[in-house]
Curated annotation (Swiss-Prot):
Native source organism of the sequence: Canine coronavirus (strain BGF10) (CCoV)
Membrane topology: Single-pass type I membrane protein
Protein name: Spike glycoprotein
Transmembrane domains' residue ranges: 1395-1414
Compartments where located: Virion membrane; Host endoplasmic reticulum-Golgi intermediate compartment membrane
Cellular compartments per GO CC: host cell endoplasmic reticulum-Golgi intermediate compartment membrane; membrane; viral envelope; virion membrane
Length: 1453
């Protein structure tokens, strides 16, 4: 690969061809071997049929160039003001297959796309490049290309897709026998590559200049080398091609007028009679019997299938005759077919503003019955005698009006009107219609042949006569003339017709329903005994001539009804079956009113009964229409409606009377085609095939199948929309199902071809035979699935390795037709905790978890518009095409909305496998997915706890209590003591009462003794007191001193004890009051917590309500849409088939038109609602993305964005059609009001400056002490400001800009006045129709009913709110209740029993123990003494059992 180096700046040149580079020289390519066949083969590429045509285009007929240079670098040349560019390979005569070629690059500039043709150096493929066979054409959006580094690797980056790459081969041994080139216009590009033509539909603005990159020695100047020659084409040229019996010849067409006319008007029909692509349709018009279409695209039946095209340069004066049957196609240009000819089209070409000679003097129409009608025009009003002289029908631009008449034998039968100023096409139908420039100028009886004489003179006129047949086609009309035709003759073309576009973009499209055609008639009626009545209606027409010879129906024409026994003019059906028959008689009269002659020639007339005002047609009465009552009358009295009776002549229709109808709807009587009287079940069923049915009065088209269902009630069963689902045969109880003949399917179209289709039934369609299954549908494709895996398995994205070209939701289709699923994006990485630190919460904040639901996507909806509106009815589908692109707009709006939403969702959402593992409670509460450092801790709901062991009090090993035996043996006295006084006293005395006074204790410096004294102490101190009293006189009073001291010490004990008790009581009271305050505060916090919980439940209920609304909105909308199918929109019925079964075609069209209008309105309302909802979801999806990034992945600094409070952290979880966020926020409970300052203005002498706070999150305020402080706005934490907190600004002036609302966009470019914008939209696009009311009904889609859960949450929230009110009352009661507590320390003292108690206990023990031992050892047969005695006696005595006397126990009860 030769490395290309070039730096290029492109400009647009206005000259024809830039030849400023002297390295490019002209080349005579005719000297190249084999070049004589280049033009011939090139021109005949698209002309395969036999015949003669003239083709025009930007063909290579100008100067060829070869560019080379001696330098080793590349250079470029610019061709400007051209419309096509061609290049060819030049090689030396001795070149071989190994000849070396130089790289070539051609860049065609345009906007928004450009074309690049790149050919690598011929020897080796570029490494890593796909097999391009050395050349590639690429469509790119890159306006500039880096030629310096241009390699094949860039193809993947600059080309728009695989559908915009065309590989080709350039081989030096071709020796100039192949031509390569590009021709472009604003609509498409034609690429001539490798003996083939590629048409690329590209709407583009071309700059008409080309940049050519060439290299050194690109001429064939040495052996084994090759070179290129180039040509830019700016002139339009014509070639005349002839293909006769395989012999091809061509010549340059130099007569511009002749060549232009021939190329514009003459073509060679392709096999099948189709007009080739690219034909201009000059002066071809769409035939219409009503108003003329001005512009637009329509699907219609038009005579565009050409059986023979006869190019006629000129006519002689002799008359020419053209017949519909037995036409001889001996002069056809191209193919000729033997199809039935419906319309003969005379296409006229003439020089502008030149009258075409004499034109045709008269058109003679040979109608049925041999009556010849002449059509001719006159330049002035004429008398009756003037009609005997021929007028004319001039072709071209005429000078003055022409008045046209229908003549018979020189008599004017009807005035037609004035001739158009310019006659360009005349078309005549075999059914009697005469069209001029597409408009139905005149209608008569069917026509057999046409004749006229014509001369073109010297006007340069050019004719074509086309024998055509009707076919369905998509016709594009501009200024009333046909511009483009797309035949609906294939599956892909049927989709084009249904979408009203000739160029299908890549995407999914509903498969157009095909016409059912003629099918069997199925009728289901109740068995009954039928009596039949044949009703014969006789109409006697009287025809005569007017003063000018026109046929006139006489007022004496008579209508006769059968007579009944009541002798009235009202005839009523008395049987339960009837059939109507009409007998028409025609008699003529001369100038009197005696009608006794037969109606011949132009007087021939037929009686026809038209629909009139009745909701059914007369000719449909015998088509199993049912009534409760049906009567005919010639008197309008009491009539419900009327039929119009007319006389149809060769020139017009004339009314002769009316038939009045009196009827009641019901099922008692039925109209039948023939007599079926007697006991019959007239039901006729055609099973398992498409049939036109009438089932218990309900009409339609479908497939009837027998089922195994058993239904006890009902005769027929309908859906919500009113469609028939099934019925029951009352004779045997068998239930039959009714299904559509065709089901809706979605076709995948790529590059204008169908590569796959999705359908709900497993049946081949669209010519696709390979299929696979998915969980929701069957997929048929051109991709051969049977070669890859077993048919019928679920498609997986891993089965086929390809890049999808089109996507819809999570489904993608590749260019080869393979189906892939594309919506899952995997992410790697371990799940880590959001936070591992502790969060400190200030006291004036509370934590709240708030729930928020945001919708992220909507379920895509695809609607088959024509199926919804017409339900497959072919006539309705034709009427639907009159609504231009209504269905296409509806379907494309939904499809494009779904594609856009799918692209946004695919780029937004991804799936983490590790996150999926934690999507259950068990996995979330498990330690398997934790980091190893956390696994050793217990896990409860994701929290790692250290256990509850620290909460329990620790055990004290030191023994502080007595045993149970001590409590039994001693009396326990409980008193109150002072600290450790009692314990120290007991330890000192050691239990000796004599040491009582010696062991006196001191408490706060005061001697004290325990207040409790036992008997020994009391006796001791009593004796001391008595001795002191007795010996007091003798000086022995000192004996009572111990008593006095002990008493005083004990009194001290009591006094100090009382003081301590008072202090303790005060301490306890204070502590208890403080405890009550804490309890009050705790209850207040509980109250706040319950209040917050109540608010939290309210937010959860609100979020769930929003989820329910989101999930059910689409189902409700679809339900509304389905219900509209029951609405008849003021038509006589909501069933299209029933309308066509009851009315004639024209009357039924008017009724069906109402249904179409109403249903399209309902569809528009649904689409508008869907698109509005998608716009809302698109905005909420962006909001969800912002919340994930700001709330979940980080901590938001915006107050209220992530919950209503200061954001801590958020969690996100999936919810139906969206995401639900759990925001943990801080809610302030107390506020401090300050006056904030935006800055400080200071002055220093003559200088004034300002200071503003640097950190916008800080607020400057002045406190009550007139000092300035700074505090964060998130929490009140005032601090003294420092100089580093401020930024100095130049001045203190504040500038305000006064502007109006109109001037705001110039200041703020993205400013939008929402209110004014909405008002403008409403004013400019106010509809002139009323959208129907769409009631809410249950639809058979997924319906999420959370009403009960939401009501329960709201009830619980209300209950919690009431609980907070009750707690507030209880808190007030607690605050008003403070109890004064009294409590004394408990001192336990054990007192020993007296000595005589112990003496009594010892005596009892001494007496009772010997007595108990004696009783146990001496009594009973087994007593110890008895046993010893028996043993001793047995050892000394021979009789062992004589001395033994058993002692029996006597038990007395």
């Amino acid at each position: 690969m030769i490395v290309l180096t070039l730096c290029l700046f492109l400009v647009l040149y206005n000259s024809v061809i830039c030849t400023s580079n002297n390295e490019c020289v002209q080349v005579n390519v005719t000297q190249l071997p084999g070049n004589e066949n280049i033009i011939r083969d090139f021109l005949f590429q698209n002309f395969k049929e036999e015949g003669t045509v003239v083709v025009g285009g930007y063909y290579p007929t100008e100067v060829w160039y070869n560019c080379s240079r001696t330098a080793r670098t590349q250079a470029f040349k610019t061709f400007s003001n051209i419309h096509a560019f061609y290049f060819d390979m030049e090689a030396m005569e001795n070149s071989t297959g190994d000849a070396r070629g130089k790289p070539l690059l051609v860049h065609v500039h345009g906007n928004p796309v450009s074309i690049i043709v790149y050919i690598s150096a011929y020897r080796h493929d570029v490494q890593g490049r796909p097999k391009l066979k050395h050349g590639l054409l690429c469509i790119t959006k890159n306006s500039t290309t880096d030629y310096d580094r241009f390699t094949a690797n860039q193809w993947r980056d600059i080309c728009l897709g695989e559908d915009r790459k065309i590989p080709f081969s350039v081989v030096p041994t071709d020796n100039g026998t192949k031509l390569f080139g590009l021709e472009w216009n604003d609509d498409y590009v034609t690429a001539y590559i490798s003996d083939d033509s590629h048409y690329l539909n590209i709407n583009n603005n071309w700059f008409n200049n080309v940049t050519l990159l060439y290299s050194r020695s690109s001429t064939a100047t040495w052996q084994h080398s090759a070179a290129y020659v180039y040509q830019g084409v700016s002139n339009f040229t014509y070639y005349k091609l002839n293909n006769t019996n395989g012999l091809k010849s061509y010549e340059l067409c130099e007569d511009y007028e002749y060549c232009t006319g021939y190329a514009t008007n003459v073509f060679a029909p392709t096999p099948g009679g189709y007009i080739p692509e690219g034909f201009s349709f000059n002066n071809w018009f769409m035939l219409t019997n009503s108003s003329t279409f001005v512009s637009g695209r329509f699907v219609t039946n038009q005579p565009l299938l050409v059986n023979c095209l006869w190019p006629v340069p000129s006519f002689g004066v002799a008359a020419q005759e053209f017949c519909f049957e037995g036409a001889q196609f001996s002069q056809c240009n191209g193919v000729s077919l033997n199809n039935t000819v419906d319309v003969i089209r005379f296409n006229l070409n003439f020089t502008t503003d030149v009258q075409s000679g004499m034109g045709a003097t008269v058109f003679s129409l040979n109608t049925t019955g041999g009556v010849i009608l002449d059509i001719s025009c006159y330049n002035d009003t004429v008398s009756e005698s003037s009609f005997y002289s021929y007028g004319e029908i001039p072709f071209g631009v005429i000078d003055g009006p022409r008045y046209c008449y229908v003549l018979y034998n020189g008599t004017a039968l009807k005035y037609l009107g004035t001739l158009p100023p310019s006659v360009k096409e005349i078309a005549i139908s075999k059914w009697g219609h005469f069209y001029i420039n597409g408009y139905n100028f005149f209608s008569t009886f069917p026509i057999d042949c046409i004749s006229f004489n014509l001369t073109t003179g010297a006007s340069g006129a050019f004719w074509t006569i086309a024998y055509t047949s009707y076919t369905e086609a998509l016709v594009q009309v501009e200024n009333t003339a046909i511009k483009k035709v797309t035949y609906c003759n294939s599956h892909v073309n049927s989709i084009k017709c249904s979408q009203l576009t000739a160029n299908l973009q890549n995407g999914f499209y509903p498969v157009a329903s095909s016409e059912v055609g003629l099918v069997n008639k199925s009728v289901v009626l109740l068995p009954s005994f039928y009596s039949h009545t044949s009703v014969n209606i006789t109409i006697d027409l009287g025809m005569r001539r007017s003063g000018y010879g026109q046929p006139v129906a006489s007022s004496l024409s008579n209508i006769s009804l059968p007579m009944q026994d009541n002798n009235t003019d009202v005839y009523c059906i008395r049987s339960n079956q009837f059939s109507f028959y009409v007998h028409s008689n025609c008699k003529s009269a001369s100038w009197d009113n005696i009608f006794n002659s037969a109606c011949t020639d132009v007087l021939e007339a037929t009686a026809v009964i038209k629909t009139g005002t009745c909701p059914f047609s007369f000719d449909k009465l015998n088509n199993y229409l049912t009534f409760n009552k049906f009567c005919l009358s010639l008197n309008p009295t009491g009539a419900n409606c009327k039929f119009d009776v007319v006389a149809r002549t060769r020139t017009n229709e004339q009314g002769v009377g009316s038939l009045y109808v009196i009827y009641e709807e019901g099922d008692n009587i039925v109209g039948v085609p023939s007599d079926n009287s007697g006991l019959h079940d007239l039901s006729v069923l055609h099973l398992d095939s498409c049939t036109d049915y009438n089932i218990y009065g309900r009409n339609g088209v479908g497939i009837i199948r027998k089922t195994n269902s058993t239904l006890l009630s009902g005769l027929y069963y309908t859906s919500l929309s009113g469609d028939l689902l099934g019925f029951k045969n009352v004779s045997d109880g068998v239930v039959y199902s009714v299904t559509p003949c065709e089901v809706s399917a979605q076709a995948a179209v790529i590059d204008g071809a169908i590569v796959g289709a999705m359908t709900s039934i497993n049946s081949e369609l669209l010519g696709l035979t390979h299929w696979t299954t998915t969980p929701n549908f069957y997929y048929y494709s051109i991709y051969n699935y049977t070669n890859e895996r077993v048919r019928g398995t679920v498609t997986d994205s891993n089965d086929v390795d390809c890049e999808p070209i089109i996507t819809y939701s999570n489904i993608g289709v590749c260019k080869n037709g393979a189906l892939v699923f594309i919506n899952v994006t995997h992410s790697d990485g371990d799940v880590q905790p959001i936070s591992t630190g502790n969060v400190t919460i200030p006291t004036n904040f509370t934590i709240s978890v708030q729930v928020e639901y945001i919708q992220v996507y909507t379920t895509p909806v695809s609607i088959d518009c024509s199926r919804y509106v017409c339900n497959g009815n072919s006539r309705c589908n034709k009427l639907l095409t009159q609504y231009v692109s209504a269905c296409h707009t509806i379907e494309q709006a939904l499809a494009m909305g779904a594609r856009l939403e799918n692209m946004e969702i695919d780029s937004m959402l991804f799936v983490s496998e590790n996150a999926l593992k934690l999507a259950s409670v068990e996995a979330f509460n498990s330690t398997d997915n934790l980091d190893p450092i956390y696994r050793e801790w217990p896990n409860i709901g994701g929290s790692w706890l250290g256990g509850l062991k620290d909460i329990l009090p620790s055990h004290n090993s030191k023994r502080k209590y007595r045993s149970a035996i001590e409590d039994l043996l001693f009396d326990k006295v409980v008193t109150s003591g002072l600290g450790t006084v009692d314990e120290d006293y007991k330890r000192c005395t050691g239990g000796y009462d004599i040491a009582d006074l010696v062991c006196a204790q001191y408490y706060n410096g005061i001697m004290v003794l325990p207040g409790v004294a036992n008997d020994d102490k009391m006796a001791m101190y009593t004796a001391s007191l008595a001795g002191g009293i007795t010996l007091g006189a003798l000086g022995g009073g000192a004996v009572s001193i111990p008593f006095a001291v002990a008493v005083q010490a004990r009194l001290n004990y009591v006094a100090l004890q009382t003081d301590v008790l008072n202090k303790n009581q005060q301490i306890l009271a204070n502590a208890f009051n403080q405890a009550i305050g804490n309890i009050t505060q705790a209850f207040g916090n509980v109250n706040d917590a319950i209040h917050q919980t109540s608010k939290g439940l309210a937010t959860v209920a609100k979020a769930l309500a929003k989820v329910q609304d989101v999930v059910n909105t689409q189902g409700q909308a679809l339900s509304h849409l389905t219900v509209q199918l029951q609405n008849n929109f003021q038509a006589i019925s909501s069933s299209i088939s029933d309308i066509y079964n009851r009315l004639d075609e024209l009357s039924a069209d008017a009724q069906v038109d109402r249904l179409i209008t109403g249903r399209l309105t309902a569809l528009n309302a649904f689409v508008s609602q869907t698109l509005t909802r998608q716009a809302e979801v698109r905005a909420s999806r962006q909001l969800a993305k912002d919340k994930v990034n700001e709330c979940v992945r980080s901590q938001s600094q915006r107050f209220g964005f992530c919950g209503n409070g200061t954001h801590l952290f958020s969690l996100a979880n999936a919810a139906p059609n969206g995401m639900i966020f759990f925001h943990t926020v801080l809610l302030p409970t107390a506020y401090e009001t300050v006056t904030a300052w935006s800055g400080i203005c200071a002055s220093d002498g003559n200088r004034t400056f300002g200071l503003v706070v640097k950190d916008v999150q800080l607020t400057l305020f002045r406190n009550l002490d007139y000092k300035f402080y700074l505090t964060p706005r998130t929490m009140y934490q005032p601090r003294v400001a420092t100089s580093s907190d401020f930024v100095q600004i130049e001045g203190c002036d504040v500038l305000f800009v006064n502007a109006t609302v109109i001037e705001l966009p110039s200041i703020i470019p993205d400013y939008i006045d929402i209110n004014q914008t909405v008002q403008d939209i409403l004013e400019n696009f106010r509809p002139n129709w009323t959208v129907p009311e769409l009631p809410l009904d249950i639809f058979n889609a997924t319906y999420l009913n959370l009403t009960g859960e939401i009501n329960d949450l709201e009830f619980r929230s209300e209950k919690l709110h009431n609980t907070t009110l009750e707690l507030a009352t209880l808190i007030d009661n607690i605050n008003n209740t403070l109890v004064n507590l009294e409590w004394l320390n408990r001192i336990e003292t054990y007192v020993k029993w007296p000595w005589y108690v112990w003496l009594l206990i010892g005596l009892v023990v001494i007496f009772c123990i010997p007595l108990l031992l004696f009783c146990c050892c001496s009594t009973g047969c087994c007593g110890c003494f008895g046993c010893i005695g028996s043993c001793c006696h047995s050892m000394c005595s021979r009789r062992q059992f004589e001395s033994y006397e058993p002692i029996e126990k006597v038990h007395v009860h």
